[in-house]
Amino acid sequence: MLLQLVKKVENIETMEKEKFQIEFPINSSKGVLYNCMSTPSGLAEWFCDDVNIKKDVHTFLWDGSEEVARLVSKKKDEFVKFKWIEDEENGESNYFELRIKVDEMTGERAVIITDFAEEDEIQDAKELWIAQLENLRRVIGG
C-alpha cells in the first residue's frame, strides 16, 4: 500500500507524459510528404519558422525561441522520428514521429503524428498538431 502511494506521488512529481496519435488525411505523393517532413526547407514551410541541422541534431526556431531535437530514425518516403534533447537529457523515452500512411485499398494518404504530452495538455498538443498539419496541407495543396 505504501509503495503504491509512493509511486503515485512520483508520477505526480515527474508528470509522466502520455502517448497520443493523430491521423490527418493529406492528398499528396509520398515523396512530397517525406520531403516536407525530412528536409530543412520542407520543415520550415509548415512546421517551424526555420531549422538548422548539424549531423542528426535539428534546432527548430519559432518566433525567436528554439527547441533542439535529435533525429533518431527515418525511412525514405515512410517516416521520421525525433527525440527532444531536453527529454533525452532527463532520461525520458518520449519522441515525436511523422509517418506517411497509404490506404492499400483506396490509395488515400494520411500523415500520422505520434507524440507525448502531459495528460492535461494532450488536447492542446493535438490542436497544435492539427494547425501545423493544416499548414502542411495548404503548402502542398493537398
Q: What kind of region is each of these model predictions?
A:
Residues 45, 91-95, 120-127:
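A short, polar/proline- and glycine-enriched secondary-structure boundary/capping micro-motif
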Residues 33-34, 43, 71, 82, ...:
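Hydrophobic pocket/interface hotspot
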